[in-house]
Every structure is written in C-alpha cells, then in structure tokens.
Amino acid sequence: MIDRYKHQQLRIGSVSPQQISAWATKIIPNGEIVGEVTKPYTFHYKTNKPEKDGLFCERIFGPIKSGICACGNYRVIGDEKEDPKFCEQCGVEFVGSRIRRYQMGYIKLTCPVTHVWYLKRLPSYIANLLDKPLKELEGLVYCDFSFARPITKKPTFLRLRGSFEYEIQSWKYSIPLFFTTQGFDIFRNREISTGAGAIREQLADLDLRIIIENSLVEWKQLGEEGPTGNEWEDRKIVRRKDFLVRRMELAKHFIRTNIEPEWMVLCLLPVLPPELRPIIQIEGGKLMSSDINELYRRVIYRNNTLTDLLTTSRSTPGELVMCQEKLVQEAVDTLLDNGIRGQPMRDGHNKVYKSFSDVIEGKEGRFRETLLGKRVDYSGRSVIVVGPSLSLHRCGLPREIAIELFQTFVIRGLIRQHLASNIGVAKSQIRENKPIVWEILQEVMQGHPVLLNRAPTLHRLGIQSFQPILVEGRTICLHPLVCKGFNADFDGDQMAVHVPLSLEAQAEARLLMFSHMNLLSPAIGDPISVPTQDMLIGLYVLTSGTRRGICANRYNPCNRKNYQNERIYETNYKYMKEPFFCNSYDAIGAYRQKRINLDSPLWLRWQLDQRVSASREVPIEVHYESFGTYHEIYAHYLIVRSIKKETFCVYIRTTVGHISFYREIEEAIQGFSQACSYDT
C-alpha cells in the first residue's frame, strides 16, 4: 500500500470481509462476478488444464499464458481494436499472465472461523478483549461448550438456566441431547450459540471505549487496596493489573487502527495467488505441489460437506453439524498455522505440512529471503577484521570494494578535473589503477559516510554509519568497541556496506547513525560500546605480570622461575636487577629496543602522593647509601628519603603494559576534557 507521503509500505493486520471481497472479486466484461473458489480441484488429469472454479481457475486468477484463454484463443494484449477483451466461451480475460502473481480469490465459509493467530498465539487477543480464560474460549470455538444467546428480552429456557459449562453434570449432558432431537433446529438456533459464531457475537457486542474506562477504573481500585499480606493474593493482584494494562493497550490499538474486533473471526478466507503456491512438473511427468494447495483443498472439502449438511439434509442431527464445523475450524487452523500449540498435521509420508505461517516466517521465509534479502546497487560485502588503530567512527574499506562503490563519484571527479574526456576514458584509468584515481577516491571518501549492516538487523544498532578510509587487503576493518551493537565478532562474520546517495540519507547517516553517537543501548540505556572478547583478552595480556610484588626477589628462592613458569635451581639462577626509569617514555623506548619485555617488572619514577607519604605500611627492606640517603622498599612502591627523612622521590613497581594502558586512558580523558571545554 502507499501512504499519504507516497511511501510504499506493507502492513499486516485484520481486514473486514468487505475488503477481502474487494481484493478477490472482479467483474468480467460480460458483467459476471468471479472470485469465489468453490471446488477443491487443481488441474484436470486428462487435459492438464486448470479446473473451472478450482484453486487454479483461469477465470478467477487470470490466464496461464499471456493473451491466451482456456480455449486456446489468442488476443493481442493492449490492442484496443481487439474486441471483446475476454473469451465469451470460457470467460477468461485476455491479459498478461503476471496477474496470477497478485490476483487473489476467496472461499466463502459456511460457518464463521476464528483466526488462529488471534486465538492461540500468546498473548491471545480474543481472550484479552473478552476477559475470559483461553481454555474456555477454545472449548467454545471447537464446539465443546455452548452458551445461551440472549437475543430476546423475554425469559427463555436457557437464559433461566444459564450457560452449559457452569451447570451441574446432569444439565450439561442432557440439554445438548434435548436440542439435537429432530425438529428442534429453529429452537436450537435461537436459544444457543457455539463455535466461532459465538465468539463473533461477543466481539461484535464489545464497546472498546467502555473496555478502556472499566479497565482503568479496576486498575485504580486494585492500586488503592495496597498489599494484603498474603503473598499469593498479592501476586494475583499484580498479574491482574498487568492484564488490565495489556487489555487497555490492545483496545487503544484497535481504535487507533480502525479495526473492528469481530474481524478476528473469518467469514471469507482469502486464497493466495496461484504463482505463490505453484504446481511444478518435474522429470518423469511427476508433479510437485506446494503444501498450501493441499491445505486449501482440505478446507474446501470440509466446507462443502458442511454446506451439503445444512442445505440438502434438513434432518441432519445437530451434533453432526457441530462436529463438521469443528473440522472446518481445524482445517483453517492448519492452513494458517500448522501445529500451533499442538501436534502438527502430516501427509502420507509423515512429513509435516508447511502452512502459511511457515512460508512467511523465519530466515527462509517470504519476507527475509525474497523481499528483504535482495542485492542492491552501491553495496558490497566482506569479512570483518579488527582495526586496532581506527577511531570509533571510522572503518577500513578495501581498495577493491571502495573503487566499486564510489566509481561513479571518481568518474565525475576525473571529468571535472579534466583528467578524462568522457566516461570511457575515466573507466579505463580506473582499470589501470593510476595513482590519480586513488587520490580522487580518497577525496571523495572524506566527505561521504558509508553504512555498515550485519544481518540479522534486530535493532537499530544493527546498522550504523562510519567514515571510510582505504586499507590494504580484502577485509573490512572495524573498531572492536562497536561489535556489541552489531552482535558481531571476528571469527568470520560478514558485514554489508552501503553508500547513502541522497542528501537526506547522508544527513541522517551523519546526524543519527554515526557509531560515536550511539554509545548507549536504546532499550535499557546501558553502555553499548564496551570492551568485549578480543579487547578483554588484549587488556589482560597487556596488564598481566608478576603480582607478588617485591617479595619475588633473590631472597626468596621459592620464586625463582622463568617466563615459562619453570623452576630454576641455584646453580642456573642469575639475579637480574630490576631497572629504574625516570619517565614512561624511557620505559617504552627500552621495550621497543627489546631491552625489557612487556611484562618485565621495573621501577618508574612517580609524582609524590600524600597518601603514600602518610601511609603506615612497614617497609619490607631498607637500603642505606654512603651519602646518608636510604631507600624504603615496599611491596609495590619505593621511597627515596634523605638523612632528615625528607622524601626525595617515589618509584612505583609496574610493567610496560601497565604504563601503555595508563597512557591510553590518560590521553582519552584529556581529549574528552578538551572537547568539553570547547563546548562550553
């Protein structure tokens, strides 16, 4: 459908019987109205042509071959001189065969049938609106229960006795037998109601606004009562309040979308276009048919049987009619959703029938596989790898992908700069990989964001925008902090890249979809850009090292171990003095020169800390020097004092990994502080 803003959209919901009839019926040029499928047949076994008024009827759904009717006559499509526009003998219009992809039909149900999605799926919409237990409604739908129909103001037999399901056992079993007696059909139809028709009557009598008002009043009353002291009663009250909220929201949704509650009970069953449920002939003359065709046939068979019972045989017992209505309800349930909360129906080979719900849902369903999974222009796909040097809002695009995505922009740049006379010359320069091509490509990419998407896109953070840069290789580089939003990891995951073309799309990508602007989860507000997986392992390796402090020295022979955690004996042990560094730059420089390892312990000069100088910790060792100064050695720091006990400097015991980690955090905080100062 197309909305008022001329946007194509798809809406799934309940529709009225009049709307179903408008979709499925059509008037052929002779004035005849067609659209109802009345026969459960598909193709004639001799002529191999669709049966009239069957599931593949050409009068209802259109010709199989464009411009050729069922009789074999041919007319030119669109030729106004050709008259008439349909075959007078078979009634088939001379139109294109593509009409069989969207022309629907319908089955006129003899008895109303509840839509299984609204009845059995949780939460049950019908049960919520009627405020009745689901088990009771299911018993009513499948003709296990009956209730009195209060259509007359005068007291009637059943209105005096009430509903069957609430009566004593003698009434429960004797009254149905009384009404099934021959000659009581009119009396039975007036007094009792059962099946989906009973549900439809109750839904039609609902006033949604009164439901909202009454539910709100009851919710307020339950809130004013307060806790009762009984845990079971309190939980019951909470569940009731939650139910009232759901009921009010459901009623508001029906009012907002102009949907009537009784539309959840079907009187007309739509029949899908035949091209969406095909019958294909394979080798050997065998036919392969969609399971939906068999399920439609089952519905038509049972519906026609019920029609015959009601029209031809007036002496049919009521119990037999109710049983046939139950079979029609079960057949429609199987067609719409086979096996919902029960045992699925199987064919002769013990294979489960694939219902309409199975066709449209899941990864291999009609929406995700056929409609949403289409390839589009200006898009690419590749494996993602970690880009540790990237900024949060950047991603690395391989040259091969980037030149294909931005080829039209590069061609325009070459022509504007008079480096190519036409499109053909520009394409040849791109194929030859001339240096000027990559320069123009980088200029184009600087002002153009790209969108990265990882399927399945379950929430809005599944697709985000990034500023692309060129990288070597054939993989997309991604900052590891954005992986949680995509639910991605670097074990072979693939991501799609798209180029926003219009100015509106580019503005949306820059203002709303950039990765550095989506740091919090839209669902619960927790940070979404947090270290995970590879980053956590890297941080652990970076900050790992000896945690025993100064105790692991030459005075403790039990701690003499190498980097492989192997014990070193007295004869082979050589004590390595831990180096001292005045600043972090010297320590990192020594690591780059391979004089020390990443996790080698060292002493780093640190700023004086009042908490250290005021600490009452007892030093492990004290080293005195000839000039009177001495070193107080603690577990994780060292203090140099004068002869007058004045503190000269402090050294902390750390590793190069800890220093690098600290510097990264310090630079990030300084950058954040500068950004805040610029904003103020």
From Swiss-Prot:
Catalyzed reactions per annotation: RNA(n) + a ribonucleoside 5'-triphosphate = RNA(n+1) + diphosphate
Pfam families registered for this protein in UniProt: RNA_pol_Rpb1_1, RNA_pol_Rpb1_2
Location of the protein in the cell: Plastid, Chloroplast
Cofactor note: Binds 1 Mg(2+) ion per subunit. Binds 1 Zn(2+) ion per subunit.
InterPro entries documented for this protein: DNA-dir_RpoC_beta_prime, RNA_pol_asu, RNA_pol_N, RNA_pol_Rpb1_1, RNA_pol_Rpb1_3_sf, RNA_pol_Rpb1_clamp_domain, RNApol_RpoC1
Gene3D superfamilies in the cross-refs: 1.10.40.90, 2.40.40.20, RNA polymerase II, clamp domain, RNA polymerase Rpb1, domain 3
Main location: plastid
Residue numbers binding Mg(2+): 489, 491, 493
Broad enzyme group: transferase
Cofactor(s) the protein requires to work: Mg(2+); Zn(2+)
Superkingdom, natural source: Eukaryota
UniProt-listed Enzyme Commission number(s): 2.7.7.6
One GO-annotated biological process of the protein: DNA-templated transcription
Disulfide topology: none
Keywords in alphabetical order: Chloroplast, DNA-directed RNA polymerase, Magnesium, Metal-binding, Nucleotidyltransferase, Plastid, Transcription, Transferase, Zinc
Gene Ontology CC, one term: chloroplast
HAMAP family: RNApol_bact_RpoC1
Family designation: Belongs to the RNA polymerase beta' chain family. RpoC1 subfamily.
Function according to Swiss-Prot or TrEMBL: DNA-dependent RNA polymerase catalyzes the transcription of DNA into RNA using the four ribonucleoside triphosphates as substrates.
Assembly description: In plastids the minimal PEP RNA polymerase catalytic core is composed of four subunits: alpha, beta, beta', and beta''. When a (nuclear-encoded) sigma factor is associated with the core the holoenzyme is formed, which can initiate transcription.
Designated name of the protein: DNA-directed RNA polymerase subunit beta'
